[in-house]
Each structure stands twice: as C-alpha cells, then as structure tokens.
C-alpha cells in the first residue's frame, strides 16, 4: 500500500523515542495525508500532551521517506523545515531546540520574525528558502492571528515570494486552542493523548470518591474573598502559586492581602515574585519540597508550552474572569496538565466556566458546534471576525 511507510516504525526504536508511539504516528499520518490535497493543516492536541513529538515524527518522515512523499506530490525538501513559535517566549524556544535538535538552527520565535520583517532585504535568501518546497511548523498557532500583526505580515511576505517564483510551501499549525482555524475550515488532525496523560477531561470526570480539583477562582483584591479562599484550603509545606492581575495597583493589593492574612494568622512562610521575562525557569524554584508554605506570585506570563513541574505544588490560582477561553485553558490550568501528573493532585482555581467550555470542546472531538463562545476572534454566528487573519 502506498501509505504504509507513514506508519512504519524503525526496528532500532528506543523507549525514549516517543515520536514513534502509536498516537503520535497516527496524528503525523493524518497530517501528511491532508498535505496531498491541502497546503495547510491545523493540529489540535491537549495541553502538554506531546505535540512536539508529532513535529519530530514529521521531521523523521520528511527526511527518511522523502522520495515516497514526492510520489504523493508532496514537495518538501529534506532539510527545508522550520519552526515558528507564534509567541515571544525565550524559555519555550530553548525547550524546543532541545527537543528538536534536527532543526535547532531553524527555530524562531516572534521576536526573530519581527527582525526578519524589519530587515526583509537582508533576509531575502531566507524568505526564498522558506517559500519554496518547505514545511513551516507554526507552534501555538492561535497566537498573533490578528490582521496586520507579525505572523500575518510574515505569511504575506512568504505568499508573495511563492507567487512571484511559482513555488509552494506547506504549513502545519499546532495548538490546544486553535478555535479560529477550526472555524475557518482548515483540515484538522486531532492528536489523542497517550497512556499516563492527565488533562482537563480527567479533572472534570472524577469518580465519586475523588476530591474536586477545579474551583472557581476568587477576587483576591477583596479581603473577604481572601479569607474565604484560605478557609477552603490547607496550609502546609508546599508551593502555592498565584497569578497576579494585570493592573499594577491590583498586583500590590493581591500581594498585600495574602501576606497580611498569613501574618495575621501567624503562619510562617516564604514568598517570591516570579517574572519569566527576567528570572530563570520557574521549575528551578520549585524542584525541591519546601520546608514551609511557600507563596510564588507570578507576574505577567506563564502559559502556552511552558512546562510546570507540579510535584510539590499544592495549589495554583489564576484570574477569576478571563476575557477569552483560550487564556484560561493555556494559563495555569494548562500548565498543570501533562504526563504522570495525576498523583500530584494539584488544586486549581481558575475561570471555571471557561474551563468547562474548553472541556466540552474536547469531549466533542473539537467540533465546530462546540467552539467556546468566548473565543477571541469568533463571532456569535461561528464566523471569524474581520480583524482575524483567517
């Protein structure tokens, strides 16, 4: 059969070669088959479920079975594969370089793309290569999808080069929340998680003897809600992670309210303020079990593909009312998903309604009819807004 090579596993596969696992192989096969008829595919996968392994499998197929792909009229050069991270996370870029050493010199994040666009003439050879018989992987493809923003400008330049030179390039997006791409009608490949995965579905589908994991977040700028919150939880020698609100005045209020409550109740504790833009990986802070309750206040970001080791985390607390569903799913809730995390039983306070919306989308196989109502660039009639690039 002409497609058999897509599911073929090398005989020297090692246990750590996750990109040859059954669920990964199945998803990569779907993507390649879509490329026979389309030049762009969107891949949907749950948070921290192994989408990078699908990328690795695609790289393997393109390099190992290039002639067979060309026989299917899929024209991708062996070494013309790029990964564009549609966000400006340096940590995530470095993680991807480690996981995908095959293309480590062709992994770019948003700031790199901005520089390429600003200096288009100097980067002409790069644009020519990227627009000719290439595969461009767009990681976290739900980000930066507004018209005239960086990714839109970047793709417009590539399309222009491809048109002028009569070339073709292939695109595959990866995200847990590509609501807009699904509404726009892109062919999708669904990656089901492998054995040992723990995600939003598991958090909602507890058996009757299990303690609840998900709770509605509190407004911690209000002292009465801070007191209610601490009455609901246990205080012990674990990590307690709080995302701070956007406004500086609210940040200070939340910090003071929590610190004052602990001091008033004579609880000995440690505390840190973590900003991923200026500090090393947060996992360096939490790799050892603390000797006393330890509060970590997170400024700005910690979402998207950032990995969070939850082994010693008792609780994470996110914003109580996010404007968009993808923000809830991709934030601390999403960071608590992953393989072999169920036993950690980390308690999650988040925007419960939006978490429920995303859960409904998952259990209905990412169907367009179950797209969350609070998606950023989608109208109530399930059409993308005019300011969306799709």
Swiss-Prot record:
Protein name: Uncharacterized protein L594
Organism, scientific name: Acanthamoeba polyphaga mimivirus
